[in-house]
Amino acid sequence: MRPVAAEITTIDNRTSVGHSFWLSPRNGWQQQPAPGQFVMVALRRPPTGFGREVCDAVPMSVAGWEPGRLRLTVKDLGPTTKALLACRPGDTLTVTGPLGHGFSLDAQRPLLMGGGVGAPPLLFLAQQLAARGGEPVTLLGGATGDEIFHRDEFPGTVEIATDDGSAGHHGFITDLLDGRSPDRLYSCGPEPMLVKALAWALANGVPAELCLERYMACGVGLCGVCTIDRDLVCQDGPVLSSERLAQSAEFGKVVREAGGIVRHTPA
């Protein structure tokens, strides 16, 4: 998959912590994305103290698709995302993708659960499921109400949970799982949340597909830092099945950071 230069045509979904871009390349996208797939976005930043220009590439899940243009949602999480949020319509980004393995689209009574920046790829998924006759129910969680992206754009029923109680249920998003009986659970967000989602799915006999957020440097399987067990999240994922993750020795326990440094997460 070759990188393409894509122009920012529109900015929408503005919040205090981020917003969305619509991107259009001059010659069109090489391939239509599927929900759950991602792109690598490269951005050149001003020279460092050593006088060298910095070029960062970050993975970003696809939040929407229309013929000729693709949507990404960015949250301020560090220097690269802050630089992306400073871009304006007419600016150009270098984009590679779509990449990875996405969600299936066969559920009729799907339950979607997104935490933080896990909401954008689920918006794309919910729209695709609804277009196929599904009746999605979506659970969205965040630290505050202002950190819940796309809350008014999801088709079907939407329920909210916030850490501070500023919107919806005051507590964890996983508190909202009780009493549900979907034919499939789809989830994206922080790994501790996904661990709880997996446990609920296995305990209730609900097939699940979880979209992992792992550190990636290349997005094409060369660097290996997104490895989980023997799988590469950038190629075998980012969406992995509950059957696969139930057998994992590393899910929820081990992550790899920049340079491949292994970090064990609290149980």
Question: Model features per residue range: what roles?
Answer:
Residues 44-48, 96-102, 252-253:
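Short, charged beta-turn/beta-strand-edge "cap" motif at the junction between a beta-strand
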Residues 121, 191-192, 213-239:
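Local cysteine-cluster metal-coordination motifs and their immediate loop/turn environment
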Residues 229-267:
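Short Fe-S-cluster ligation motifs
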Residues 1-89:
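Ferredoxin-reductase
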Residues 10, 64, 160-162, 210, ...:
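Structural signal for conserved beta-strand scaffold positions within catalytic alpha/beta enzyme cores
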Residues 79-217:
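FNR/FR-type flavoprotein reductase catalytic core
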